[in-house]
Amino acid sequence: MTDESSDVPRELMESIKDVIGRKIKISVKKKVKLEVKGDRVENKVLVLTSCRAFLLSARIPSKLELTFSYLEIHGVICHKPAQMVVETEKCNMSMKMVSPEDVSEVLAHIGTCLRRIFPGLSPLRIMKKVSMEPSERLASLQALWDSQTLAEPGPCGGFSQMYACVCDWLGFSYKEEVQWDVDTIYLTQDTRELNLQDFSHLEHRDLIPIIAALEYNQWFTKLSSKDLKLSTDVCEQILRVVSRSNRLEELVLENAGLRIDFAQKLAGALAHNPNSGLHTINLAGNSLEDRGVSSLSIQFAKLPKGLKHLNLSKTSLSPKGVNSLCQSLSANPLTASTLTHLDLSGNALRGDDLSHMYNFLAQPNTIVHLDLSNTECSLEMVCSALLRGCLQCLAVLNLSRSVFSHRKGKEVPPSFKQFFSSSLALIQINLSGTKLSPEPLKALLLGLACNHSLKGVSLDLSNCELGHCLRSGGAQVLEGCIAEIHNITSLDISDNGLESDLSTLIVWLSKNRSIQHLALGKNFNNMKSKNLTPVLDNLVQMIQDEDSPLQSLSLADSKLKAEVTIIINALGSNTSLTKVDISGNGMGDMGAKMLAKALQINTKLRTVIWDKNNITAQGFQDIAVAMEKNYTLRFMPIPMYDAAQALKTNPEKTEEALQKIENYLLRNHETRKYLQEQAYRLQQGIVTSTTQQMIDRICVKVQDHLNSLRACGGDAIQEDLKAAERLMRDAKNSKTLLPNLYHVGGASWAGASGLSSSPIQETLESMAGEVTRVVDEQLKDLLESMVDAAETLCPNVMRKAHIRQDLIHASTEKISIPRTFVKNVLLEQSGIDILNKISEVKLTVASFLSDRIVDEILDSLSSSHRKLANHFSRLNKSLPQREDLEVELVEEKPVKRAILTVEDLTEVERLEDLDTCMMTPKSKRKSIHSRMLRPVSRAFEMEFDLDKALEEVPIHIEDPPFPSVRQEKRSSGLISELPSEEGRRLEHFTKLRPKRNKKQQPTQAAVCTISILPQDGEQNGLMGRVDEGVDEFFTKKVTKMDCKRSSSRSSDAHELGEGDEKKKRDSRRSGFLNLIKSRSRSERPPTVLMTEELSSPKGAMRSPPVDTTRKEIKAAEHNGAPDRTEEIKTPEPLEEGPAEEAGRAERSDSRGSPQGGRRYVQVMGSGLLAEMKAKQERRAACAQKKLGNDVISQDPSSPVSCNTERLEGGATVPKLQPGLPEARFGSGTPEKNAKAEPRVDGGCRSRSSSSMPTSPKPLLQSPKPSPSARPSIPQKPRTASRPEDTPDSPSGPSSPKVALLPPILKKVSSDKERDGQNSSQSSPRSFSQEASRRSWGPAQEYQEQKQRSSGKDGHQGSKCSDSGEEAEKEFIFV
């Protein structure tokens, strides 16, 4: 680190570090006087770092006055010796320094940093304008910069450093993934194209610094973007790069949403950059229109290098804009010799006003690819122009959907035929969709037939059935000409309506000996079956011909259906076709079966396309079986349409068959080509760059100690210094270690620059000659043996004169193997494999040697650094006055700059955080491993957090049984009882099926059965009260429940006995949906008390068990099945007293529920409350009378007393006593009451008296109507099971399901409360007292609850099972 300047006090320097960040390395610091208004000056401190300057106040505490990036500098003026004026984008600063040397030092540092960050660029160019007087000062600075030795730039011309500097300049966050992609992927691919599609997942604003770095980068020459809508800011940055960069050569912005204004601005940018190297422009798919293209055309005429590639397809051009463009192209003398690709397709150019375009094409030029498709331009006019200017180079001519304005009775222009007969380079002619009458077609074919310069021409005449294209007359022209054309290798005549003439046309096509690819699709649509068979027979004869050159046949979209099997059956023994396209024929599974049979024996086919054939899973399976036996087919695209349909009906078999087909294709397809340099570049990009970063880091530390100890005496110190210097030289040379090791001796075995053969190639060539000689001898012997065998079998025929010699002579040509075959096999296949293996071994050895040597260098450097550090520390103890120097030397840990908004450090900064002692071979390998892992994209972090979204979904484990009930919606007359043992073995397969809501309201008679329900079960009697529970709704408090029984450790015997079988069934329900519903559908223990479980993260909390309760529960469980009741949630208001308790209860509920969401309270008006209260009182009187009559009518041997227990919520719960009639709650046996009674008692033990009440209670009110009697309202899923989800519990003949009262929310005991349960029972609230409170009325009840809620903290202990945790206020929504 640089020594502190003498004119900057130490205290001030410490304050400056606090302002700009202590881990930012300060390179230069100078005291300056900043000129302000007038002649007034202020004392400031100028601090320079690697890419930014800071101007701070010269007092303590210091304050940041101004900061600017070196890239913001627009000019530096030094007209006075000690004065420097810096011009930036924001302001101008005039600073006076102590001496002229200080000015030179500041400028020298800025220039050095710019040269290091932007290699290949002069600092004077980046700073734009530097003026110094006298001029010798600037010359000395330039000489200083030129004399500095720069390190090798990083990957892709040091793009990552430039990107970081530009992010600092523009104030954008640094994206590590951009740096990783460029330094790794781009380096490995050795590409010079920066594709914005690679970063399309980032925000548009993050693309700005990536593009801005191209202004200074000397590696990338192409900027491309396709189908990516670019924002205005991104477009502005692209324009800036175009206007300033002389390295950018290709600009591709296809379908980027650009408009006229961008084209005009691009023209301005080109005008601003006279040294532009741009020669390729692709603006296809952007609505530039005539105005935009006209502006660009002016600059096209001035491009210093001319245009090579111009694509303006689909840019809304008219003939006027095209004329303007072609006029400008003609004005540039370089265009005639440089332009090779011109694409104006997709623009409406119909009409005769294209004179400038025709003139441009008529001039001698070098256009190789001309695309005027979909322009409706005049075909004969274009060909006439091409005849004069494009005969030498034009290879690809696309004039599809153009217009041939030929009138019947007039001759075809001779230039049309002459162009095709005179062209020297045409290989592709596309006239599809063009209206061609027989005369132009004949001229075209005869022109090609007369041209002996062309070879391998591809002619596309598809879809020419647009009027009088190829009907009859056209077919006859084809028949008369096609057989003699020798230079057409690919012919597409599909979709031309040739049905009636196809039979004879195929005969003539079979006589052509040059066509290798033939497309006949969409020509069979209107043919009858009797006419189709002869056509297909002729086609079969054509492909079965031994001398047929045909290699590819397309019958796509011909709708041949079963008739296509005629062709398929001929494929089995076919020896010429390598590609067949039978898609779109609807052949079905039978056709697939035939294709499978053909593939089992065919060894020539390499490609089969077979989509849109209505093939099902069975057809795919047949093909998969055939592919197992086929080892030559290599390309068989997945039939997407058929596969999509088959996956809907039979996904398992379809997926299995498709996977098998792909596996067999992979087996057949063997890739031999290997990029030998790709693995080397990847090794160099990741391993070597990371290693060199570590070496550079430790070398800096060693060099600091060398500088500090160089003047010290002592033999030991001097010896260590010399050893360190030798190690530094080795470390510097190690940067080229891997390249030198990898390329050493390359010319000796791989050939020197490809001019001479390598020893391996020479050996293989000599071997090929020897193998060819041996093969020829073997084949001759084989021929002689065959003729001898023929004489033995047919001696009479073979005795004829000269027959033997004639057979041998005729067979010699057929049995010989081309001499180039063996050579190609050995050199191109075996030779490539050998060379690839050698390259792999060479890279492995070079990497191993380089890695071991670098490990030794790192180890030695670390040891040397420790020795020098020890010397320095001992020396520092003897020289305390140099303490400030030691502080500066130690302070080298970089951090995030305060100016930068960078959240993540780069790899270099992370390496700088390592201590020197950690720079070992082990840490190097760990760093390399980290370097190979691509950073997580920020774009994903901005999406939803999947872990957070799933944290509330319960883990799919077997839930403990919950208290649950079942509402029976059917009338008692329709219930058929089953024996209890029989019921346990039955399984309700439709229990998950949603049930229809009842539309008919319950009758009044059913309402009256709330007091006494007969044995046959009248459960619907509880549903008739619409206004039931209104007072509880406004007075009840939300409290915790003490019926938590989810813990398996605290489960009683009755929870395990009846729930085991159901738990086994529930455990088999898996999947994400059942996972969420698992808690709501869990089995609950039998009870008559309606409760809801509110789970807590800390486990279940329940009241202490009672011995008598357990005994009674076991007895009841042994005797019969429990009753099921329906659980009905009652919304309860939150009041000032119980607000916290309600919040805790709901918080526990939200944690336990799968959704964990908030619930809300419905609010009802006071007028409705009063009206419903009056109805409630009248019905209560009726119910009391009915209950009295029913009690009198019961068996006198079973006296009962019905008690209700009022809890804090204001709800009432039936309290069963021994004297209560057995039919009171739908049970005709004492076991039912014995089973239900302890459940209520035990469940309410913490809130009620332990002793049995002696006074009777008032009669029960009508309970709240069930949800089935209300309009169905969508509700959030809750923890409690729904009636539709709860399975039917088995019961005996006398145990019908009974719908009881609404549930009450009860407090869950905490650990502290549970310990004090026994003592709290000394002052219980009796059931008679609770009953008397029930008869007060709403007002007294409300006051009583307020009093109880205000003092319940002292009575009841903890309010929440999770004590100490602040509950959040949540509500219940019904």
Curated annotation (Swiss-Prot):
Protein name in the entry: F-actin-uncapping protein LRRC16A
Species classification: Eukaryota, Metazoa, Chordata, Craniata, Vertebrata
Compositionally biased residues, Polar residues: 1191-1204
Principal location: cytoplasm
Coiled-coil positions: 714-738
Organism listed in the record: Mus musculus
Family per record: Belongs to the CARMIL family.
Region listing for Disordered, in residue ranges: 961-982, 1040-1374
Example of a GO biological process term: positive regulation of actin filament polymerization
InterPro entries membership: CARMIL_C (IPR031943), CARMIL_PH (IPR041245), Leu-rich_rpt (IPR001611), LRR_dom_sf (IPR032675), PH-like_dom_sf (IPR011993), PP1-Reg/Actin-Interact_Protein (IPR051279)
Effect of residue 993 to E: Loss of ability to bind heterodimeric capping protein (CP) and to inhibit the actin-capping activity of CP
